[in-house]
């Protein structure tokens, strides 16, 4: 029996890339009689139907049958949650659960500091590297030593793309420990129902004779929506640019696009509306510009629906590993709005090119970024430790 402890930042119903990967890993191991799992994370205000979490509470519950210890938080500094109960709960789990394998999702410097206290314990350490700390430069410098100690102690380091290994100043020093496990999409949540199909017909009617470009994500700087809006201003009225999501930049983005009737802001969309837009759009726009975008699940989902993608070159990011230039879509020089607009124009005018890239895009996702493939790689990782 192998006991596995995962340490993500948060856990479902909190929505985020790291949280989804942690859930994917846990789900991939469910049903194995030789494995027992536990998860420790911060608590956060989040809900999904009757499943409600409160930031300040320290509780234990279950997600998909796996025990989750959620530690109440009193504040957040530089995107890092702080908790008074976390050290005690981590100590209890390490001493009582006695994990054979600890999967630590990086970055999480507050927890990394406490985890170091148990480095002499007899567990295998997997550092699951989601992204470099690039935005919070002071935080990155402050925890530089901790990061090196984590990587030195690690038995394996998981990156989500080979691009990130080569582009990270940390991972490139520890290539011999690194393996690649790409993130995955969950196709069960992407299946159209009657409501979706009805919405599809409505959208087709609304946007007939238009080239529909769809983008979806949080409205934050690294997502690059300002560049998509600037590119839209260079396009003719045959285009419509639909942007789903919300965030700190929503108001400023709307202000920037106020004189451009081609741009429509959809706000937060339901899964059903999201699927409908995936199905109806002609081009999937993913204008992220920095390594904070380490992979791009929404990008992979759009490609799964046979949509050619238009991305920017991001050195060291997995975005350009997901979308292959001139094979599954078009890659533009970083921040070059003129090139981005020309890419959209070429795909709009070239139906054969759109279809070629779209078919290749779906094939790439099916061959590389599916849940079963992640499960196999996680199994290889666990069994090899």
Give each language-model segment a name.
Residues 1-55, 64, 152:
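N-terminal subdomain of nucleotide-sugar transferases
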Residues 305-313:
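Short hydrophobic beta-strand element within catalytic cores of glycosyltransferases
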Residues 279-294, 307:
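Acidic donor-binding loop of glycosyltransferase active sites
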Residues 5, 197, 203-223, 229-233:
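Conserved donor-binding/catalytic core segment of Leloir-type glycosyltransferases
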């Amino acid at each position: 029996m192998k006991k596995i402890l995962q340490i993500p930042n948060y856990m479902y119903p909190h929505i985020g890339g790291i949280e989804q990967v942690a859930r994917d890993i846990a789900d991939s191991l469910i049903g194995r009689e030789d494995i027992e799992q536990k998860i420790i994370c911060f608590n956060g205000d989040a809900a999904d139907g009757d499943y409600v979490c409160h930031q300040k509470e320290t509780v234990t519950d279950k997600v998909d049958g796996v025990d989750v210890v959620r530690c109440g938080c009193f504040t957040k500094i530089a995107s890092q949650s702080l908790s008074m109960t976390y050290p005690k709960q981590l100590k209890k789990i390490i001493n009582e659960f006695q994990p054979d394998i600890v999967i630590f999702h990086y970055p999480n410097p507050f927890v990394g500091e406490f985890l170091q206290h148990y480095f002499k314990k007899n567990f295998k350490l997997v550092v699951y590297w989601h992204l470099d700390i690039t935005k919070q430069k002071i935080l990155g410098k402050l925890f530089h030593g901790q990061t090196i100690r984590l990587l030195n102690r690690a038995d394996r380091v998981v990156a989500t793309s080979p691009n990130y290994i080569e582009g990270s100043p940390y991972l490139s020093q520890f290539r011999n420990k690194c393996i690649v496990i790409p993130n995955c999409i969950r196709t069960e949540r992407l299946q159209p129902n009657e409501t979706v199909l009805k919405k599809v017909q409505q959208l087709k009617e609304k946007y007939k004779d238009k080239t529909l470009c769809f983008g979806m994500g949080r409205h934050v700087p690294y997502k690059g929506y300002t560049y998509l809006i600037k590119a839209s201003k260079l396009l003719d009225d045959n285009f419509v640019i639909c942007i789903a999501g919300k965030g700190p930049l929503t108001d400023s983005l709307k202000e920037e696009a106020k004189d451009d009737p081609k741009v429509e802001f959809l706000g937060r969309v339901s899964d059903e509306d999201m699927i409908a837009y995936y199905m109806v759009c002609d081009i999937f726009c993913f204008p992220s510009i920095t390594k904070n975008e380490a992979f791009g699940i929404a990008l992979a989902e759009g490609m799964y629906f046979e949509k050619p993608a238009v991305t920017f070159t991001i050195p060291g990011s997995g975005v350009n590993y997901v979308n292959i230039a001139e094979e599954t879509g078009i890659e533009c020089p970083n921040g070059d709005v003129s090139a981005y607009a020309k890419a959209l124009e070429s795909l709009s005018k070239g139906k054969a090119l759109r279809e070629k890239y779209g078919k290749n895009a779906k094939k790439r996702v099916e061959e590389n970024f599916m849940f079963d493939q992640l499960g196999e790689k996680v199994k290889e990782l666990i069994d090899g430790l």
